Amino acid sequence: MEAKVEEKEPEPVENAGPDAPVRLTPMMEQYIEIKAANVDSLLFYRMGDFYELFFDDAVAASAALGITLTKRGKHLGEDIPMCGVPVHAADDYLQKLIAKGYRVAVCEQVEDPAEAKKRGSKSVVKRDVIRLVTPGTLTEEKLLDPAQANFLMAMGRTRGDGALALAWIDISTGTFRVAETTPDRLFADIMRVDPRELVVADSAFHDEELRPVFDLIGKAVTPQPATLFDSAAAQTRIQHYFNVATLDGFGQFSRPELSAISGAIAYIEKTQISERPPLMRPEREHEGGTLFIDPATRASLELARTMSGNRDGSLLKAIDRTVTGGGARLLAERLTAPLTSPKEIALRLDSVSWCLSEQTLCEALRLELKGVPDMPRALSRLAVGRGGPRDLGALACGFEAAGGIASLLDGALLPDELAAARESIEKMPAGFAAHLDRALADELPLLKRDGGFVREGYNSELDEMRALRDQSRRVIAGLQADYIEETGIKSLKIKHNNVLGYFIEVTANNSGAMTDTDEAKSRFIHRQTMANAMRFTTTELAELESKIANAADRALSIELAIFEELTAEAVAHADSIRAAASALSVFDVSTALAVLAEEQGYCRPHVDDSLSFNIVAGRHPVVEQALRRQAANPFVANDCDLSPQRDGGDGAIWLLTGPNMGGKSTFLRQNALIAILAQMGSFVPAGSAHIGVVDRLFSRVGASDDLARGRSTFMVEMVETAAILNQAGEHSLVILDEIGRGTATFDGLSIAWAAVEYLHEKNRCRALFATHFHEMTALSEKLERLSNVTMRVKEWDNDVIFLHEVAKGAADRSYGVQVARLAGLPEAVVNRARDVLHQLEAGETSGKADRLIDDLPLFSVMLQQEKPKPQIQAKDSELANAVAAISPDELTPREALDLIYKLKELAGKA
């Protein structure tokens, strides 16, 4: 944005408000008027080289940004709070405000202060809001994460039946999708897309049935007038936006889908004011085309973010080997929405297989891909008037890389997905690419107002203006040489002063050559006679003087015109540019997944329509990599077979028992993650994998209080379990960990027992069920499709060694006391716990509390601590005590070596 000179503020005038006896300046009157139309946004009010904020906006912004709060004038007898940010750094401040949930209205000066003065001394420079900056409508590079999409989502609803649909748009790339949903799926579908902003009709926002969903989403929800979502007017709005006479080529949309599309487009028009971001035509997603993962499962499996909200530690971070922003976003999209069509999954797997078989070629492809900038986002910035020369340069650089990739792939026998991508790359606008190469300089400025981005030789007039601007002395010297040759006057000079400007000066003795003939007089125009010299000008010199004076302005004007010409050409080729960019992202993801598979030893899964789920030597992709980084023991691979025991049968249930810290939760999660990886089209961390398509994935692993909604840990657990039991079908995969642990033992056991029976008899799905209720292992005798498996351990001298191996059978203990000891509980507490455990196991107390109290008196922990230790002869017992105190699993190699020497020394003394 160009800086403008701030106008002098006119004298105050009486405020029009009846209860406002103080006087406001015309500028402040203008501010209040504009702010009144943007009450839900912070108003960035342009004053010269700053955006100023006043009143409550200033208070909020100063706190959010950590900038000084000052004051300017008074209103209603109170000081007017004020703060400001420089225009050149506005993006940095916008980023902070958007991250904190604010929306910002950018108010610019829309006329030059000189024009305002022509209307009178008290006139205020015209200002207007040119854009509303909201979380879902960002385009600036600084405000966007290159690896994440930035979706604006709109929810549509029909009046009669209340049918729902969602439309989501990333205006930074042009992506536009729409899908129907239902009230029970609404939250899950929203969280799958993970929009930065959700726009809903104000009537729907206050709907009692939907309000809990909006409460969960929080500040990201933006209520808007219901008229924006009118499905009856949607067709006209869509036709107007896409500049088409009919929607026949768009496909068929339901009424709620039209409502959602209308709401999304209307909000973009509202926030972008006069600009129109180029969008792809809405692409419809069909129900059942992707794996349904509810929000609780998505969170517990830490697909894109960990439970604490970080990308590090997530599955996405573990598998991401992409080298472009577009590729990273496509990978994230595939991970969060795995497919359910074996045919489509196979197409993606074929691409990865081809890349693995052509590793040399793929290494060359990745080198080219590393040079691909974010073309769709550059295009979007150009289209909405926020682009710069470097955005044009990004397109040029992308075209060059695409050309290199097309050359590398020339003649290659590609699988279907990659062949289609190559075709899109080959259709990129070669003429426009060549135009950019001719027009753009090698080094490009950030801002177009700085000029210097057009290549020398592209435009002759621009070259002339630059020459005049940068080399005026040389141009004048050249013209002087021409005049000397023409007149034969060796002493002729071209000089300059502030009165005459440029002029030709000759001695009086030589002036005859310029005055003796009519032709000479018409050629050399007399300007001034001096005592010993005469001064002349020419039409040519006068024009040159004017050109020199205006050369800089003219040069910039020409460059800006060229910029607009190139921008218009880019927008005209938007579809082919986006198609080529999408194709490059496909190659990036395919090669990245091949690199991952080679690097981590992944295998190609076999995915079909069966109910099989047979994983041989499966591993947890995140934990395995973490262990490698720490140079720790290698991950222990385990099998998992939930396939039907006979043809036509239902999937199996594994009941998993074992100690805490034994690896149960890791085993459960890894199988869910393997299913997700397989269906997103990735190789998987296993020796082999045969997976019948999972249509719904449910995971209840770990829980916490939901204090904001008044839910205890147990209540959260029960709500999530209820959702699973009510929705899982035969093609579902269910992962349940320690159901019933948050309540009394018998209550928890009863609930877990009944839940397993229901999964077996009613849901009839493939399931992994981990529990510490060892009594449940008896279910294997009653339920034919249920098998007992356990995490293997070894015991040694009251300690437990976790083998992290899954084996057939059941555990009879949970080894909680040993784990407590490893966690560092005081030795007295551990010993006391061991005594209590022995009494409980020996007595089978079954609720006989009085006998238990007699056997285990209160405060016995303290009594044990306070018992005087028997006096023993150090010489006789020191070696035995030292051996007894050893905890082998807690020793480092160095400590073990030192201990051996110590024991040898003690043995010698004995």
Curated annotation (Swiss-Prot):
Keywords: ATP-binding, DNA damage, DNA repair, DNA-binding, Nucleotide-binding. Residues 1-21 are annotated as: Disordered. It comes from the Bacteria. GO terms for biological process: mismatch repair. Pfam families: MutS_I, MutS_II, MutS_III, MutS_IV, MutS_V. The keyword Lipoprotein does not apply. SMART domains: MUTSac, MUTSd. Belongs to the DNA mismatch repair MutS family. HAMAP family: MutS. This protein is involved in the repair of mismatches in DNA. It is possible that it carries out the mismatch recognition step. This protein has a weak ATPase activity. This is DNA mismatch repair protein MutS. It comes from Brucella suis (strain ATCC 23445 / NCTC 10510). The lineage of its organism: Bacteria, Pseudomonadati, Pseudomonadota, Alphaproteobacteria, Hyphomicrobiales.
